[in-house]
Amino acid sequence: VHTTQFAIREPKHGLFRPVLRLVAEALDQHEAKSRNIPVRIAGICGHTAQATAEATMARELGYHAGLLSLAALDKADDDALLAHSRAVAEVLPILGFYLQPAVGGRVLTYRFWRRFVEIDRVIAIKIAPFNRYHTLDVVRAVAESGRDDIALYAGNDDQIVLDLLTAFRFQVGGRLVERRIVGGLLGQWAVWTHRAVELLEQCHALANTGRAIPADMLRLAAEITDANAAIFDAANGFAGCIPGIHEVLRRQGLLAGTWCLDLHVRLSPGQADEIDRVCRAYPHLTDDDFVASLR
């Protein structure tokens, strides 16, 4: 999602199916060489007709699930949102997606999420409202549902480390229920991905000990948030989020440029300087050497 763009769906570009097919082919090659079988997740957008068509296409191309954006249904009430979600889930298992309003999402209440997790073919939720209250709404809804087969994924790029380390506990029916966010579907992890894998493993290891969070992890959490602010262009309401990701990949030689399908989307003034700053300040967050070793 973060290294393509929502605009691939527009008829004038016609890139949605080619992109899904290309990724599927790359995953096929990976599976042929490795014992690891990745979960294949396609982004699903639009009103019900478009979303079910995209889900059908993804299923035909071998995808296991769809990450369901509700951004297009910005005026719909909970009943309509749930009917839409059920329709897509009939085609393909779904991951819920709480997208922050600053980039086209909408506020989704605890009551919505409590009903959403009653859909049988919901297998996970990406939590990305960039809001602590709204994050808790989702985790509590899952905890109170009694379902332990729904995975929670971090999407709050401003709080990656603490989301992965926190044990969320709620009283449910007189007993204590604990849920954890088990992984991330993060734009920040579209870059410096080798380090992201190491970070996730480190967070899992710490969480499994049950010990207090070390001070160096709290410091690392702040450093990653600072780096993300530059890459995502937080100072300008995330206007340069996609080209910011592209710029990091360009510097590593993985992309030829930062162009976007929407020609108006480009790096914000001063954003490249901010990326320079965080790269100098936090070289341990980058994976330039790893990328260079594979070229």
Where does each model-flagged region fall?
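A structural signal for short hydrophobic/aromatic patches embedded in well-ordered alpha helices
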Residues: 19, 116, 275-276
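Hydrophobic, Leu/Ile/Phe/Ala-enriched alpha-helical segments that form helix-helix packing faces
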Residues: 23, 27, 31, 142-143, ...
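Catalytic alpha/beta core domains of metabolic enzymes, predominantly
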Residues: 87-90, 95, 100-241
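Structural alpha-beta junctions
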Residues: 28, 32-34, 144-150, 207, ...
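C-terminal extensions of enzymes
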Residues: 226-295
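Active-site beta->alpha loop and helix N-cap motifs at the rims of alpha/beta catalytic domains
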Residues: 1-113, 264, 289-292
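Active-site catalytic microenvironments for nucleophilic, acid-base chemistry
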Residues: 26, 202, 251
